[in-house]
Structures are given as C-alpha cells and as structure tokens.
Amino acid sequence: MQRRSPPKHRHDGASPLPLGMDWSPPPRNWNGRDTIWPHDFRTGWSYCVTIPSWTLLSKSKNSDPIVFYRVQVSVQSPEGVSTMRGILRRFNDFVKLLADLKRAFPRKSFPSAPPKGFLRVKSRDMLEERRCSLEDWMTKLLSDIELARSVVVASFLELEATARSACQVVDQNASDSNDDGNSTSLSSLVHPNSGGSSLLSSDYGSDTAYETSELGSASLGQDDVSETDTGDLTLDEDLTNPTEKLVKFSMSNIDEGLSMSQTIIEQLEDFPKHRVHLGYANDITETNSYNGKASKGVFRANNDLRCRSESETSHSVMHDRKLSLESADGVSLLAGETSTSSILSSIVHSQLDVNHDISVGNLEIPGNGRIVLPLKMHSKLNRILLTMNERLLNSKTDMEDLIARLNQETAVKEYLNRKVDDLEVELETTKQRNKENLEQALMTERQSVTKMQWDMEELRQKTFEMELKLKSKEDGSSDSKTSGNSTISESHELLQEMDATKQQLEDLSRRYVELEAKSKADIKVLVREVKSLRRSHMEMEKELTRSLTEKSDTEKLLQQERIIVENTLEARRRLYSDCEILHDRLKVNNTNLSMDESSNNREDLSEVSNALQDQIEAQLLLGFDETASEDELRKIMADMYED
C-alpha cells in the first residue's frame, strides 16, 4: 500500500488531533486567556508545549524522592481564548516517547534526547539544566508537523483531556456572555475532521495530570481536589495511575447512563396518554425543578429535539485515521453522556408552549420533575435513547477490553524487567570471567618477558667482561713492542670471539623466539591431544564398563552351563550303573530260565525288549532333550522292574 505524503502546512484542515488542532511555538509572554500567540488565532485550534518547572515527590517517607517535570500544554481556540493544562512526566517518559516515535517513524531522523547522566545526582543546577534541555528538545521534535500530529505525541501530552478542558472553558465563556443562559454544546466545538478522534490513554509511567485554571490552582484529573501547588500533593493524589482513574470514572458513568436510559425507555413505553390544558402545563413548568434549579424560559420541543439529534449525528462521525478505530467508542461514550445530560437538562430546565387541544404524554424523571412532550415526538426520543443505550453498552465493552489490555501490558513489563535483571547478572559474571582470563594471560607474558630480560642481562655482562679484557690487553701491548704482534693477534682473536659471542647472542635470541613460538604451537597441540585423550579415556572407560558387564554375564552363563553339564553327567552315570545292574540281572534271569518253559514267556520277553528298543528309537527320532530322555528311560526301567 502506498504511503500517504506528509502534510504540507499547519491548519490545513487535515489534522487528526482533537478539535483539528496543530502545534504552534509558545508565546513569549503569558497574559491569561488573552495571551497573544505568534500566529493568527482565526486559522484554527492550536497547542504549544512548555516545561516551566520540576518537582520532587516520594512514594513513602523512607524512599528517595522522584523527579517529575511539569509539562504545560496550552491551547488557543479560534476565538482567541487561551487555556492551560499541566501533566507530570518523568525523564524516562521522554526517553520512551522517543523510542515510540522511532518505532512509528523508522525512516525519519530525530533530534537526540538529553543525556540521562547519573541516577543518584539530583542537584538543582543539573535538574534545571535538564529541564531547559527537555524543553528545547520538545520544541525541535514538535517542529516536524508529521510528529506533532502523531498519535504517540497526542497520547504523551494527553491532548484529548486538554481539548475537553478547553471546550469547557469556552462553553463557560459563552454561557457567561449570553443573557439567556443557553450553554454551547461540546459537539459544536469539535472539528469536522476530528469528530471521531480516539480517546487517548497515557501509558507513560506513574504520571499525574493537573489542570491549571485562571487562578493558577491545580486539580488532579477529573477529581474535585484543588491544590495551590502540585509540589504539596500527597502520594495517593499525585502518583495514582491516570489510566486507572479514567477507567473507573468512565465505567461508573457508563453504568449510570445505562440505568438512566433504561428507566426512561421503560417509562416512555408505559406512561399514560391524556389531554391536558394549557394551565396544567404551565403549572408543571412553573413548579418543575431538577437538581435544585427551577425551570425558566419557553422552548419548542420540535426544535430542541432536532437540535439534539443533529448534535448526536455530529458526535457519531468516525474519523478514518489509522489506530483510532480501537478507541472510537470512547468518543461515543463521551458524546452519549454529553448528549444525554444536555437533552435532559434542556427538557427539564425549559417550559412547554403547547396549545389546549394537543395530546401530550406524562413522564416522571429523577428530581421530582415531569416532562411534557407532544405525542408525535415519543418515537424520536425513544430511538435517540435506544441509540445512546447501545453506545453506552459498546463503550462499556471497549472499556473492559482496555482494562484487560492494560493488565496484559503490565504483566509483559514485569516479565521484561525480570529478564533485564537476569541479563545484567549474566553480563557481570561474563565480565568477571573475562577479566580473570586476561589477568592470567598478562601474568604469563610478564614472566616470559622477565626471563628474556634476565638472559639479555647475562649476555651483556659477558660482553662487558670481554671488552674489559680486550682493553686491558691493548693497554699492556703498548708497554712492550716485542709482544705487539702477539697482542694484535690476541686482540684480533678477542674481537673475533666478541663477534662470535654477538652472533651467538643473536642466534640465541632468534632461537628463543622460535622456541617460544614452537612452545605455543606445542601447547596447542598438547591441549588438543589432552582433550582427545580425555574423550578417548571416557570412551575406554565406558567400553571397559560394558566389557566387565558382559564378562560377568558370560561368567554367570558359563557357571549355569557347568552346573547343567555336571548334572547331566551325574544323571548319565546313574543311568549307566542302572543299565549295568539291569544287564546283570537279565543275564542271571536268562541262565535261570529253564528250557521247558513255555514259548509264550520267551515271546513276551522278546516283545518287551522290542518295545523298549522301539520306544528309545522313537524318542531319539523326535529329538527330546537328554534330561527328558533319561527320565523316560528311568520310567521304562521301573516298569520293567515291576513286570
């Protein structure tokens, strides 16, 4: 999707901010409502941002104070009326604002934020310097028209609440200037392009909003508590989350609006219809009161309802800017509450001008008053109240969604804080470990350098001794001319020895470097070999354990086999002895048999022996095990003994 081009100039009617306002440089001198701004106020609504002061607030008696900067948001209406509203912001909130803007506009370059500095240092000079830096930084930031119109800046400055307070001041001025006491509706002041502006909720820490009136008193948010200075606020009044206060206030107003609209709808459907006279209507309007104020003036019901319907229509316009859809029902909530209060107040505080023959309805409302309406206006009022009821229900649902989203964001923030703490601990541990490793490496290098210096010192000492010997020999050669040749030869030899020593020194130094490099390489190789040996040692230990386990299992099996073989041999020995005994007995029986015995007995013996052989052969063919065969043979022999 093609991105829209940035706006060309300010007050072009395309600002998505509440009331279609645009940023303007702050005026140099403040003169209350009649302050002169550096532009033509007839071009539209304008706002400016200044940071006039800072304050120190503490959460408890024993805790350290927290620095809050007073951000003053001033608004000028097209009539030239200036209003101011202040909010408290911490330095971290400005840093978060810059981070949110960078995420929203990744291709845009931003002015650098003031440095954070030391957390514990909170001198007045440093805080005053930071206040000035923050004010200049905000001016540079808002000089960009695209940033000044962004949702992030509107949420940070709470322009929605500032616009509401400005509208209230303008309404108050209009009501004071009009003699008939008719107040201007909030919807008539809303810019056409910002009718559906989203209800922006601030999420910049524990900040507190204060509204500055003409007298300079500050009031916290929507509360009725008034203080002469925000520095004297208590903890509960100053550090309460403005989002939670806004949620509670909106939910209570939604519930009240729902109950009121439901009651009016039920009474509109069920109230009796009759004809009244003009005198009775005048008596009602004269004695009718609401919230302790008597009704005055005469109005036309048709004109009032038409005016309120148009006001409802203007409040239901939804803006098409991105990121405003989620909170569009919040504006409907505000519009519904304003329209409801304006309709009821205008109906109750006005008199009816009806004829004697008009059929009217009777409706009782809170405040011991009655509404007298023409019969044909009942359906219109019923539709208006149903629409307001639906808007209130939608607003209540959206408020519950906002509460759930706020709780979710709080949980995510706590999780990220814990994650950051863990990462900080891990970073400190890593730094300590790296520091220890570096110190150990430096110690090793220092030892090697010290050793090399000692070697160099020894070589220098030897060289110096040889030079002394050479000089002494040269001095002795001048005394004797006869030994000159020998001295010269000795000096040459000494020079040669010195050159050889120098060469040897160079060789030793070069060899030392080579040995050092080789030792490092050998150390690396040894480290790798040690690691491989450790791995192989572990593998060998595992294999040895496995071999020992297999050996023990094999020994157990071998022992079992030996026991089985011994049992088999013993059984065979017994069988063999039984067979010998049987054979001997058969021989004795054969010799004792007489020749005259009947042939039948011989045939029986031969049949028994044949049956025995057949049974043995059958068992061998079937492949029984030896133990079963021996048991069977014993059984057969027992049968033979019995026979």
Swiss-Prot record:
UniProt-annotated location(s): Cytoplasm, Cytosol; Endosome membrane
Compositional bias of kind Basic residues: 1-11
Segments of skewed composition (Low complexity): 194-207
Keywords: Coiled coil, Cytoplasm, Endosome, Lipid-binding, Membrane, Protein transport, Transport
Keyword Transport part of the UniProt annotation: yes
Molecular functions (GO terms): phosphatidylinositol binding
GO cellular component: cytoplasm; cytosol; endosome membrane
Membrane topology: Peripheral membrane protein
Annotated GO biological process: protein transport
Compositionally biased intervals (Acidic residues): 224-239
Residue segments, region Disordered: 1-26, 172-239
SMART domains reported for this sequence: PX
Entries under InterPro entries matching the protein: EREX-like, PX_dom, PX_dom_sf
Gene3D superfamilies per the UniProt record, alphabetical: Phox-like domain
Known role: Acts as an effector of RABF2A and RABF2B. Involved in vacuolar transport of storage proteins. Regulates membrane trafficking to protein storage vacuoles (PSVs). Binds specifically to phosphatidylinositol 3-monophosphate (PtdIns3P).
Name the UniProt record assigns to this protein: PX domain-containing protein EREL2
Annotated organism of origin: Arabidopsis thaliana
Taxonomic placement: Eukaryota, Viridiplantae, Streptophyta, Embryophyta, Tracheophyta
